[in-house]
Amino acid sequence: MSEDFRPRSDFLQTLLLRGYVHQCSDLEGIDAKAQSGELVAYIGFDCTAPSLHVGSLVQIMMLRWLQKTGGKPIALMGGGTTQVGDPSGKDESRKILSLETIEANKAGIASVFSKFIAFGDGKTQALMVDNAEWLTALKYVDFLRDVGRHFSVNRMMAMDSVKLRLERDQELSFLEFNYMCLQAYDFVELNRRYGCVLQMGGSDQWGNIVTGLDLGRRLGAPQLYALTSPLLTTASGAKMGKTAQGAVWLNEDMLPVFDYWQFWRNCEDRDVGRFLKLFTELPLDETVRLESLGGAEINEAKKILATEATSMAHGREAALLAEEAARQTFEEGALAESLPSIDIDAAEIEAGLGVLAAFVKAGLVASTSEARRQIKGGGLRVNDAPVADERAALQQGDVASGVIKLSLGRKRHVLLKLV
């Protein structure tokens, strides 16, 4: 991307200034389309779980900003591609899901989007479509003859998603090898049906997306464009959206609103400014002001981040209730005054303290083997959330007002106080 490029469209100005852009095939072309008011763009979401988590939130926000700046977003549900499995970023083959599971997952994922974008038949109203509509209707021989002949196996083998698996001598099934062909075909089909000219996604999808551009050119489609967002990690390098309790889900039935609010409140100081730009709609000058706060004042910025981000996912009322619950729990000292505590070096949490070791250190269990038994029985909790994975580690995202609450059963609790 050219550093001299100055976008004229509100869409690209917003994405560039707020940090959403990693790679782009043609900034000038996308800018012109956005200025014309004719930009239709999509992002695909495979149905591998009953909810999306905050790792997908950057992409959802890109669709939201597209709509707010006059474009038309398409949320593509991968009812067809999920049956194959995307090998991108994976060390082993994905588990094959039943059609019933895929449908149930699709319903859970679809419920997220109405919180962020408006659906309907209007020019800028969003569409939700499922690639199973066309992929499951394809005839194999016809697809090979009409579409497959345009793919170069040489180029496919050079894709990171393929090359890394082969270099590590890890199996890559023929099923997964075909995934990029289906994703490329999705782009062409969405162009034919809805005039979609831009595919967006995470940086790990760049190879798949530009394959779609190439296929469109070979099949005579109009000019198509690609744009990806950066891989999102915390300032300490941890994968975005992971805590000791697991993924930070967007659906309330999989993660309480209070825990969602706490996730944002507990972000690292160095992440506050970046997250305010990406996950809220606060004016940029306000995000800069909040980012510049130091000392204890940075906690006020984190509360604003938490409430704004939670408002989008769960509504303003629920966000304010979560904020008040946190105030009563942590700031009025309800926990600190009544529970035993031990001091722990903040560097241990920064490095990722194993949850088994943490419970031993807190004196709640005598050994890691006892901790494992308690986890199997649902007896260990971190910040009142059950620990399901014995390999989990406590991280900065688990810290609330300088403490982490560990519980054995319902009656034994210890606070880890960071020093």
From Swiss-Prot:
Keyword Mitochondrion: no
UniProt xrefs under PROSITE patterns: S4 (PS50889)
Residues reported in the UniProt entry to bind L-tyrosine: 42, 179, 183
Gene Ontology MF: a single term: tyrosine-tRNA ligase activity
Binding site for ATP: 242
Entry EC number(s): 6.1.1.1
Biological process terms in GO annotation: tyrosyl-tRNA aminoacylation
Top-rank lineage group of the source organism: Bacteria
Motif 'KMSKS' region positions after renumbering to this chain: 239-243
Reaction equation(s) it catalyzes: tRNA(Tyr) + L-tyrosine + ATP = L-tyrosyl-tRNA(Tyr) + AMP + diphosphate + H(+)
Primary location: cytoplasm
Residue ranges occupied by any S4 RNA-binding domain in the UniProt entry: 353-419
UniProt-listed Pfam families: tRNA-synt_1b
Motif annotated as 'HIGH' region, chain positions: 47-56
Cellular component, GO annotation: cytosol
Residues spanning the signal sequence: none
InterPro entries documented for this protein: aa-tRNA-synth_Ic, Rossmann-like_a/b/a_fold, S4_RNA-bd_sf, Tyr-tRNA-ligase, Tyr-tRNA-ligase_bac-type, Tyr-tRNA-ligase_bac_1
Keyword line: Aminoacyl-tRNA synthetase, ATP-binding, Cytoplasm, Ligase, Nucleotide-binding, Protein biosynthesis, RNA-binding
Subcellular localization, as worded in the UniProt entry: Cytoplasm
NCBIfam families: tyrS (TIGR00234)
Quaternary context: Homodimer.
Similarity field: Belongs to the class-I aminoacyl-tRNA synthetase family. TyrS type 1 subfamily.
Protein name: Tyrosine--tRNA ligase
Annotated organism of origin: Methylocella silvestris (strain DSM 15510 / CIP 108128 / LMG 27833 / NCIMB 13906 / BL2)
